[in-house]
């Protein structure tokens, strides 16, 4: 079950995260004592070839984020209970990978436990955006992740990053798309199959569509055909 994933993005000049986001946006310190802050030191294992090719091609690496207490059911429920709901999106998906169906699900007044139960039992995914700004523990974890990458990858030194937590049902569809900003997807719990298609190959995506995505004038979703398989 692909229950939780941390999607961390590195940005260029178009995107900047303030060094000290507004204090009222953070919720962690109100309820989480210092002793409960994450002790886990992220461990990322990249081969020598992957370090040399980082940022030039898709890479697969191992990590230990699944050992963090931040991704247990109890921690996810607590996060959802205290998370600013205007930054949380619940979306129900369809069954046809060629037909994009993301229906917004209302979650006002729905507890974190109820949301997590709906994810486990349905065809739903939660897009917990800006999780690093809403909870300092996740910000600290992402900072440690990038500190590891910076130490391992020559020339890698991002000036800004942000994190999104994805909590998805085992049967939820992730539709064919292309991410604009450079992204790292850290799969944490459950099992997930991922299809990656050749970059800049116009059999799978037209260059004009990619240009529109990077220019911010169209959504990241792309037309999908079963012939791609």
Question: Where do the language-model regions lie?
Answer:
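Long, hydrophobic, well-ordered secondary-structure blocks that form the structural core
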Residues: 138-153, 157-162, 173, 187-188
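A short glycine-rich, His/Asp/Glu-containing loop-to-beta-strand
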Residues: 59, 159-167, 205
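Transition-metal
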Residues: 6, 12-15, 25-147, 164
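Short, surface-exposed loop/turn motifs at beta-strand boundaries within globular domains
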Residues: 52-56, 121, 158-160, 169, ...
């Amino acid at each position: 079950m692909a229950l939780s994933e941390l999607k961390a993005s590195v940005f260029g000049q178009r995107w900047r995260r303030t060094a000290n986001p507004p204090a009222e946006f953070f919720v962690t310190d109100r309820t989480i004592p210092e002793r409960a802050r994450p002790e886990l030191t992220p461990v990322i294992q990249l081969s020598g070839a992957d370090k040399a090719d980082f940022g030039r091609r898709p890479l697969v690496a191992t990590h230990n984020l699944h050992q963090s207490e931040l991704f247990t059911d109890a921690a996810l429920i607590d996060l959802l209970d205290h998370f600013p709901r205007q930054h949380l999106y619940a979306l129900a998906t369809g069954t046809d990978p060629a037909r994009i169906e993301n229906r917004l699900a209302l979650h006002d007044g729905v507890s974190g436990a109820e949301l997590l139960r709906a994810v486990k039992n349905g065809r739903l995914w939660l897009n917990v955006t800006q999780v690093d700004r809403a909870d300092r523990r996740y910000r600290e974890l992402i900072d440690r992740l990038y500190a590891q990458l910076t130490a391992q990858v020559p020339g890698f030194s991002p000036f800004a990053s942000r994190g999104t937590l994805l909590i998805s049902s085992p049967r939820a569809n992730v539709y064919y798309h292309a991410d604009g900003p450079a992204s790292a997807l850290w799969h944490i719990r459950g099992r997930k199959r991922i299809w990656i298609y050749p970059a800049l190959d116009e059999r799978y995506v037209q260059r004009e569509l990619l240009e529109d995505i990077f220019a911010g004038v169209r959504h990241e979703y792309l037309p999908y055909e079963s012939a791609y398989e």
